[in-house]
Amino acid sequence: MSKKVVSTTTAPKALGPYSQAILNDNTLYISGQIGIDPETDEFAGATTAEQAHQIFDNIDNILHEAEFSRNDIVKAALFFDDIADFALVNDIYAQYFDTTSVEEFPARSAVQVAALPKNAKLEIEITAMK
């Protein structure tokens, strides 16, 4: 078993005592990402849509740093501050994976939580495997 910290300046730095991602053998665990632009350390926008797009950019950048791709994602966990945004995020999520078959999407869970760090609208955690 080999465990390696994955870190990139093209995604926001951790807000607490955790790594952006951990690569353990062939599995990449990406910590929950919120819609912070790594260049400004501020939210990419106030809306769920703006934050969702930034989250997917951040995830892409971490995947790239670990030499993984979107096709390697096997599980996504979505945390909403308001589950009413579920359909909106589904549309953005579907564009991100760019697939026509629901069977090709990663496994996923989506829940509403009481609050997210920095009052984010959405947080997404990813597991990817090669």
From Swiss-Prot:
A single GO cellular-component term on record: cytosol
GO molecular function: deaminase activity
Family the entry assigns: Belongs to the RutC family.
Protein name per UniProt: RutC family protein in leuC 5'region
